[in-house]
From Swiss-Prot:
<dbReference type="InterPro" id="IPR003650">
    <property type="entry name" value="Orange_dom"/>
</dbReference>
<comment type="function">
    <text>Transcriptional repressor of genes that require a bHLH protein for their transcription. In the larval brain, required to maintain the self-renewal and identity of type II neuroblasts by regulating the expression of the transcriptional repressor erm together with other self-renewal transcriptional repressors such as klu and E(spl)mgamma-HLH. As part of its role in neuroblasts development, has been shown to be a direct target of the Notch signaling pathway, however might work also independently of N/Notch. In the developing larval and pupal brain, required for mushroom body differentiation.</text>
</comment>
<keyword id="KW-0238">DNA-binding</keyword>
<dbReference type="GO" id="GO:0005634">
    <property type="term" value="C:nucleus"/>
</dbReference>
<comment type="subunit">
    <text>Homodimer. Heterodimer with E(spl)mgamma-HLH and E(spl). Transcription repression requires formation of a complex with the corepressor protein Groucho. Interacts (via bHLH motif) with sisA. Interacts with da.</text>
</comment>
<dbReference type="InterPro" id="IPR011598">
    <property type="entry name" value="bHLH_dom"/>
</dbReference>
<dbReference type="Pfam" id="PF07527">
    <property type="entry name" value="Hairy_orange"/>
</dbReference>
<dbReference type="GO" id="GO:0007540">
    <property type="term" value="P:sex determination, establishment of X:A ratio"/>
</dbReference>
<dbReference type="GO" id="GO:1902692">
    <property type="term" value="P:regulation of neuroblast proliferation"/>
</dbReference>
<keyword id="KW-0217">Developmental protein</keyword>
<feature type="compositionally biased region" description="Polar residues">
    <location>
        <begin position="385"/>
        <end position="395"/>
    </location>
</feature>
<feature type="modified residue" description="Phosphoserine">
    <location>
        <position position="407"/>
    </location>
</feature>
<feature type="compositionally biased region" description="Low complexity">
    <location>
        <begin position="18"/>
        <end position="27"/>
    </location>
</feature>
<feature type="region of interest" description="Disordered">
    <location>
        <begin position="349"/>
        <end position="416"/>
    </location>
</feature>
<dbReference type="GO" id="GO:0007465">
    <property type="term" value="P:R7 cell fate commitment"/>
</dbReference>
<dbReference type="GO" id="GO:0005829">
    <property type="term" value="C:cytosol"/>
</dbReference>
<dbReference type="GO" id="GO:0002052">
    <property type="term" value="P:positive regulation of neuroblast proliferation"/>
</dbReference>
Length: 435
C-alpha cells in the first residue's frame, strides 16, 4: 500500500481531498505559481507531517489487530488502546517468541548456547577495548556500558545453568581470555553507575523460601526471576566406615539383619502363620494324604464313589469355609466314627448340613439309637472326601434324592429306611431358611 499517495488512509485524520488536486503523479506538490524551493518546502511541510501521522496510525492499527490475535485476546474488549500499550505488547510478544526460538534451538543443538556466549563475550571485549582507547568519552558512560555488558554476560551464564545440558558446561566454556564460571566478572570491577545497572548474579544473595535456596536474578528479557541452583548431580554423602570386626560393624550387621527380617517375613513359625490364614483360604484335609493314588481309594460293592473336585477357588462365604473346616476335624476324630456306625448319618454319603441349616432345623438331631436300625451291612468309606457345600434349595433336594437312591442298596430294612427318608425330606422342606 502506498502511504505517500493515500491521504485518507486513516479515519483519525480529516484529510481533505483538495490537497490531492495540487499533487502530481509522483506524490510531490506542483509549482503552478512559480514559488521558490524554500517556499514550496514550507508549504508542503504540514501536508507531509499529516501524511506521516496517517502512516503511523495505520501501522499501529494493523499492529494492534495482529498483536491481539497473536496473544489470543478479544478485540471487542480492547477497542481503545494507547499507542504506548500497543508498542509494549508488541515488544513483550517478540521477546517471548525469541525465548521460544532459543529454547527450540537449545533442544535441537545444545552447543548453540555455547557458540552464542562465546561470540557475545568476544564482541563485548572488543567494545570495551574500543571504548577504553577512545578519548573524550565520559567516564560515567564508559562505566554504564561496561556494567551493562557484565549484566548481559551473567544473564547468559544463568541461561546456561538453567539449560543443564552438560556437566562441565560452566567450567570450560570460554577461552582463557574470556570470562569463566568463577565469581570474577567479565571485565575489571567498576564502581556502581548512576542507574544501578551493575546488579549481577554474584552480588545477589541467596534467599530461603519454603526450604529451598533461591537466587534472585534477571532474565535476558529484563524480567525478574528466582533461580534454584543446580544440585541434582551432587552425590549423597558417604556413610561412616566401620571395620567388620569392630563393635560398630557388628551393630551395623545386626541392624541390617533386623531390617532384612522385617522386609522379608518368611521366617515366621507355624504358630504365627496359622493366625495369618484368611477366612477365605481353603483348609487342608489331613485325613487323606495329598499324594494318595486313585487305585487305593476303593469302595465296597453297593457303594457309589463321589467325584472329587480339586479347586483352588475360594468358597462361597467365610461361614461355609469355617463350617467345612470344623466338620472335617469332627469327621477325622474317632468319636464321630463310632457315632456314625450307630446312626443313619453314616449310611448317607452326602456331607452333613451346614451350620446355618442345622441352626434353623427345628427337628433336632437326626441320629437314632443303635437298636432302631443296624447299619452293619454298609461300612463307611475308606477316606472322607471334602466337597464344596452349596447352600441352595435345589442342591439340598438333589442330595436327598441321591441319598435315597444309595440307601435303597445299603439299607437292611427297606420300609423303615424309606419311611425315615420321607420324614427327613418333609422336615428339610418345612425348615425356614433366610435365603
Amino acid at each position: 500500500m502506498d502511504y505517500k499517495n493515500d491521504i485518507n488512509s486513516d479515519d483519525d485524520f480529516d484529510c481533505s481531498n483538495g490537497y490531492s488536486d495540487s499533487y502530481g503523479s509522483n506524490g510531490r506538490m506542483s509549482n503552478p505559481n512559480g514559488l521558490s524551493k524554500a517556499e514550496l518546502r514550507k508549504t508542503n511541510k504540514p501536508i507531509m507531517e499529516k501524511r506521516r501521522r496517517a502512516r503511523i496510525n495505520h501501522c499501529l492499527n494493523e499492529l494492534k489487530s495482529l498483536i491481539l490475535e497473536a496473544m489470543k485476546k478479544d478485540p471487542a474488549r480492547h477497542t481503545k488502546l494507547e499507542k504506548a500499550d500497543i508498542l509494549e505488547m508488541t515488544v513483550k510478544h517478540l521477546q517471548s517468541v525469541q525465548r521460544q526460538q532459543l529454547n527450540m534451538a537449545i533442544q535441537s543443538d545444545p552447543s548453540v548456547v555455547q557458540k552464542f556466549k562465546t561470540g557475545f563475550v568476544e564482541c563485548a571485549e572488543e567494545v570495551n577495548r574500543y571504548v577504553s582507547q577512545m578519548d573524550g568519552i565520559d567516564t560515567g558512560v564508559r562505566q554504564r556500558l561496561s556494567a551493562h555488558l557484565n549484566q548481559c554476560a551473567n544473564s547468559l551464564e544463568q541461561i546456561g545453568s538453567m539449560s543443564n545440558f552438560s556437566n562441565g558446561y560452566r567450567g570450560g566454556l570460554f577461552p582463557a581470555t574470556a570470562v569463566t564460571a568463577a565469581p570474577t566478572p567479565l571485565f575489571p570491577s567498576l564502581p556502581q553507575d548512576l542507574n544501578n545497572n551493575s546488579r549481577t548474579e554474584s552480588s545477589a544473595p541467596a534467599i530461603q523460601m519454603g526450604g529451598l535456596q533461591l537466587i534472585p536474578s534477571r532474565l535476558p528479557s529484563g524480567e525478574f526471576a528466582l533461580i534454584m541452583p543446580n544440585t541434582g548431580s551432587a552425590a549423597p554423602p558417604p556413610g561412616p566406615f566401620a571395620w567388620p570386626g569392630s563393635a560398630a560393624g557388628v551393630a551395623a550387621g545386626t541392624a541390617s539383619a533386623a531390617l532384612a527380617s522385617i522386609a522379608n517375613p518368611t521366617h515366621l513359625n507355624d504358630y504365627t502363620q496359622s493366625f495369618r490364614m484368611s477366612a477365605f483360604s481353603k483348609p487342608v484335609n489331613t485325613s487323606v494324604p495329598a499324594n494318595l493314588p486313585e487305585n487305593l481309594i476303593h469302595t465296597l460293592p453297593g457303594q457309589t464313589q463321589l467325584p472329587v473336585k480339586n479347586s483352588t477357588s475360594p468358597p462361597l462365604s467365610p461361614i461355609s469355609s469355617i463350617s467345612s473346616h470344623c466338620e472335617e476335624s469332627r469327621a477325622a476324630s474317632p468319636t464321630v466314627d463310632v457315632m456314625s456306625k450307630h446312626s443313619f448319618a453314616g449310611v448317607f454319603s452326602t456331607p452333613p448340613p451346614t451350620s446355618a441349616e442345622t441352626s434353623f432345623n427345628t427337628s433336632g438331631s437326626l441320629n437314632l439309637s443303635a437298636g432302631s436300625h443296624d447299619s452293619s451291612g454298609c461300612s463307611r468309606p475308606l477316606a472322607h472326601l471334602q466337597q464344596q457345600q452349596v447352600s441352595s434349595t435345589s442342591g439340598i433336594a438333589k442330595r436327598d434324592r441321591e441319598a435315597e437312591a444309595e440307601s435303597s442298596d445299603c439299607s437292611l430294612d427297606e420300609p423303615s429306611s424309606k419311611k425315615f427318608l420321607a420324614g427327613a425330606i418333609e422336615k428339610s422342606s418345612s425348615a425356614w431358611r433366610p435365603w
